Amino acid sequence: MSRIGLAPIAVPKGVDITINGQVVNVKGAKGTLEVELPEPITAAVEDDEIKVSRPDDDRKNRALHGLARSLVNNAVVGVTEGYTKKMEIFGVGYRVQQKGKDLEFSLGYSHPILIEAPEGITFAVDGATKLSVSGIDKQLVGQVAAYIRRLRKDDPYKGKGIRYDGEQVRRKVGKTGK
């Protein structure tokens, strides 16, 4: 059985926590996040720690307990440190350019692809083939990075496409022919 939900969340200096029913507001140096807790789960602030609790040991409540604790912890880390996903582009002629807050990709299609930065997300381009997606909301950063990766998924035969930094792509051998 996982015991993630039982661990208290340390609240660093400069972070304000406000609990209003099932909604936990986390305010820090980088911004403000709001986490809505699942129905039976409750949270309380005690001695610079957030404690998440469940009413009973029902199977569903145990699962939601760990989830709620992780969501609140992600919000605390997000407003203090933030989250970043680094990505690389591989392939001849594949590149990315920053246009203001947005990104413009050239990925071998007949047209360039423009990605607008959602609110709370910032893009940074390093050279023509490296980029990073940053923000305070872990879920939104991962979602935007996954959308960008989906524009041109890594090809297992040629190794061309967009991948996360450090991601290992399983290469396949092509047909041998006669």
From Swiss-Prot:
GO terms for molecular function: rRNA binding; structural constituent of ribosome. GO terms for biological process: cytoplasmic translation. It comes from the Bacteria. InterPro entries: Ribosomal_uL6-like, Ribosomal_uL6-like_a/b-dom_sf, Ribosomal_uL6_a/b-dom, Ribosomal_uL6_bac-type. This protein binds to the 23S rRNA, and is important in its secondary structure. It is located near the subunit interface in the base of the L7/L12 stalk, and near the tRNA binding site of the peptidyltransferase center. Belongs to the universal ribosomal protein uL6 family. PANTHER family: 60S/50S RIBOSOMAL PROTEIN L6/L9, LARGE RIBOSOMAL SUBUNIT PROTEIN UL6M. This is Large ribosomal subunit protein uL6.
